[in-house]
A protein has these predicted regions:
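Conserved PLP-enzyme active-site core in the AAT-like
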Residues: 8, 16, 20, 24, ...
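Short amphipathic alpha-helical segments
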Residues: 58, 84, 285, 289, ...
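Conserved N-terminal alpha-helix of the aminotransferase class I/II PLP-enzyme fold
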Residues: 45-97, 119-126
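Conserved C-terminal alpha-helix-loop-beta "cap" of PLP-dependent enzymes
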Residues: 300, 308, 315, 319-409, ...
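N-terminal "arm"/small-domain region of PLP-dependent enzymes with the aminotransferase-like
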Residues: 2, 8-67, 75-76
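Active-site beta-loop-alpha junctions enriched in small/polar residues
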Residues: 162, 191-193, 328, 354, ...
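PLP-dependent enzyme catalytic core of the Aspartate aminotransferase-like
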Residues: 4-6, 84, 125, 134, ...
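Short, acidic Gly/Pro/Ser/Thr-rich loop/turn segments
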Residues: 24, 42-46, 234-235, 296, ...
Length: 435
């Protein structure tokens, strides 16, 4: 049973179970990944400690930076996404914030898709400007508009594989080509896509971020985020990313590009931002997220299967005004959906109920199986009214610009039996019809 296992030779479904722990735990022979509940690590001697702190020797230094349970999770996600390295963090918000802060620090600018998660929109529109980072929100489908928005101080283009909440789909290949033509990295939030359905790095993305709280964890139990470094972007070429390529004074002049090569970006985020600001994921959270990863493909198949049937049900329902799902032929992104999501997807989407906010709230309040909460991508079916919750910080103009109306309802389709899901939705419509 001994011998080196080369995981790159295996399929996704096998990698999601084994990468990072190809053999049993060497200390205990445990087959499951142990929870390493420790704050710090013993060095062999003073020279060993100095080598670790100087980044000359890879390994554990302190629990704020690394943990062996976390390490397995990072290796597994990096492998599934096709990246060279990953960094797990305490939340998806931390992953996005650290990524954009690292790229656009000291007066940088971000070109961002305007139809994104409300929390990310607020980060870009209101919080990062307080740190000297500005953003321009664009119609990500209009490459001319994206190109025009690029400035001399632009440091990244930011997008989501499936927009929140309406599941619109940007053309990753085209955006990657545009970004690279201008010497910029393309940052892709693949939370809703997941590496099982789409791997943005294969389409030219340079950095992939996730809220692991969603599909990766899959059970609504654990907060977590992850940054995946493709290892393909040349940080030295443009001279616009000195924090990553130039000697760093807090590491005695270490250049991350020279010290670690392709993994320079994610190493910089770990060694500097995580070290100094501490959005550390706990070993227990990393363990729970690993449990989710092990069934990712199975759950996504069921999510996609159920979603297809719910979309069909809603499309033909007399009390539904419109269904916003890219699988529908009339959806403007249907061609891109066929290209990027051949195995289905988009289990988080919206529909517009006939009526207004009152009807939307009444429908939601009378569902039994669907839970009214702010999370998505749970094994359980979820529902929310975006205009008064997740996107409530937006102005009326911003809501309209993102296609969020008073009668818009967001669904996150779970893995329950499809008959029960549809019966629950039908009951919500019935209550409205009966007044």
């Amino acid at each position: 049973m001994e011998g080196r296992i080369i995981m790159s030779e295996y399929k996704f479904e096998t990698k999601q179970l084994h990468v990072g722990q190809e053999n049993p735990d060497p200390a205990t022979d445990a087959r499951a990944v142990p929870i390493y509940a420790t704050t710090s690590y013993v060095f062999k001697n003073s020279a060993h400690a100095a080598a670790r702190f100087g980044l000359a020797d890879a390994g554990n230094i302190y629990g704020r930076l690394t943990n062996s349970t976390q390490d397995v999770f990072e290796k597994r996600i990096a492998s599934l996404e096709g990246g060279v390295a990953a960094l797990a963090l305490a939340s998806g918000a931390a992953a996005i914030t650290y990524t954009l802060q690292s790229l656009a620090q000291n007066g940088g600018h971000i070109v961002a898709q305007k139809t994104i998660y409300g929390g990310s929109y607020n980060l870009l529109a209101h919080t990062l400007p307080n740190f000297g980072i500005t953003s321009t929100f664009v119609n990500i489908h209009d490459l001319n508009e994206v190109k025009t928005a690029i400035q001399d101080n632009t440091r990244a283009i930011y997008m989501e594989t499936l927009g929140n909440p309406n599941s619109d789909i940007p053309d990753i290949d085209a955006l990657a080509e545009l970004a690279h033509k201008h010497g910029l990295p393309l940052v892709v939030d693949n939370t809703f896509g997941t590496p099982y359905l789409i791997r943005p790095i294969e389409h030219g993305a340079d950095i992939v971020v996730h809220s692991a709280t969603k599909f990766i964890g899959g059970h609504g139990t654990t907060l977590g985020g992850v940054i995946v470094d493709s290892g393909k972007f040349d940080w030295e070429a443009s001279g616009n990313y000195p924090a990553i390529s130039s000697p760093n004074p807090s590491y005695h002049g270490v250049s991350f590009t020279k010290a670690v090569g392709p993994a320079a970006f994610v190493t910089y985020v770990r060694a500097i931002l995580l070290r100094d600001t501490g959005a550390t994921i706990s070993p227990f959270a990393a363990f729970l997220l690993l449990q989710g990863v092990e069934t990712l493909s199975l759950r996504l198949e069921r999510h996609a299967e159920n979603t297809k049937k719910v979309v069909e049900f809603l499309k033909n329902h007399p009390q539904v005004e419109k269904v916003n799902h890219p699988s529908l032929p009339e959806h403007p992104d249907n061609t891109l959906y066929q290209k990027y999501f051949p195995n289905g997807g988009g289990s988080i989407f919206t529909f517009e109920i006939k009526g207004g906010q009152e009807e939307a709230h009444k429908f939601i309040d009378n569902l039994k199986i669907f839970s009214l909460l702010a999370n998505v991508a749970d094994a359980k079916s979820l529902v929310i009214h975006p205009a008064t919750t997740t996107h409530s910080q937006l102005t009326e103009e911003e809501l309209a610009d993102q296609g969020i109306k008073p009668n818009t309802i967001r669904l996150s389709i779970g893995t329950e039996h499809i008959d029960d899901i549809i019966a629950d939705l039908q009951n919500g419509f019935k209550v409205i019809k009966e007044g």
